[in-house]
Amino acid sequence: MKKKMLEGIEQEVITETLDNGLKIFLMPFKNRKNYSINYMTIFGAAIDKFKVNGKVCTPPSGVAHFLEHKMFEQETGEDPFEFFSKTGSDANASTGYKSTSYTVEGINNIEENLEFLLNYVNSPYFTDENVEKEKNIIVEEINMYSDEPESRMYNESSKAIFKRHPMRIDIGGTEKSVRNITKEDLYCCYNAFYIPSNMYLFISGNFDVESILEVIKNNKLLNEEKNSVAVSVIRPNEPLEVNKKKIEIKLDNVVKPKMIFTLKISLKDLHFKDKYKFVLLTTFIYDILYGSASIFKEEALSDNLFTEFVASKMVIDDFLLIEFMAESSSPEKLKEKIVEYFNNKEITKDDVERYKKTYISSYVLSSDRVQSTLNGVIESVVDYGDVIYDKINIIRSITLDDVLLAKSKIDIDNSSLVIAYSKK
């Protein structure tokens, strides 16, 4: 067991790796009543090809999401959601491109809830019948999301950005791919990726560390000996250049045009803290140039270029995506203004110092919340490979030269624009 503090906020992080490879991260809070648990496998929709003991597997798209659904069906017939409801807790699960998480939040019964969580995630039960039954449910879910403008636009944006990467396909897959999923596909993926050495257990909040570790180490299903497997993920050779510069679509439920303008930036050869620092520097850039207090936003609003505007980022494999999402009657003009500001707007030392204070303040304030602390540690581990304990010191070390150097490495022309117009 190792103990280390998140610097600047004095939050302890206790880490331990079990003999079976499970990596545990505990963040005990003394001044909070609630807790949050996240049991995660590094298996998401972006993994669509892999080797198991030398054999290549290419399951249908959407299998990670399908697997998440089926984990809630137990051979005993017990419903995990019903169990957690009876203990006064909230349970959920989510599949992303990088990972799949099973979560529990509550105030009481943490040991009982943790035991049940470990048991059901380690008890797969897939049959031909229950797999077939689930297909209609998931297809209905896919069709429901395909009618939502934002969901459809994200899918089109991924196709514009990526040429070969699995992110081109929606997390849930397609109706055709879902119809082709078999129980053998589910067991193949489960046995390859739902193994302790590929999983993480994050717990934050009010709990006794020794009692929690005892529950984990004594859980029979988690610690039973399993057949060893050699798994290697096969990544596509994805080029840096975007696949398409522009896509226009027409949708029924769009009134004013919507747009997603995405930059594709290489993170190749950047690892751990260097990778984190570069992503942080890009955050400085888009907050300074396009944030709520920027001249850009003031001018764009004055020119009626948007009614909604937000920027976000995503790290996926060797790429950083920066996305500008807006509702705009003139999406082409708005995109041109974004590019113009990137190329011509000066970033000053005062800008950098102001946002350093903003980021540090935000980090300190969020550290007092159980869920925020948990999410911060999870993001560090999933995106950068380990906990980054000295985030505050990295923020403090940022200089104007750092920001300008990072900006010089961004090719804003390596971008795509997706516009959704009304069909009417």
Predicted segment positions?
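Charge-rich, well-structured scaffold segments of protease-associated domains
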Residues: 74-232, 272-277, 293, 298-424
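His/Glu-rich zincin catalytic helix
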Residues: 1-79, 187-297, 415-424
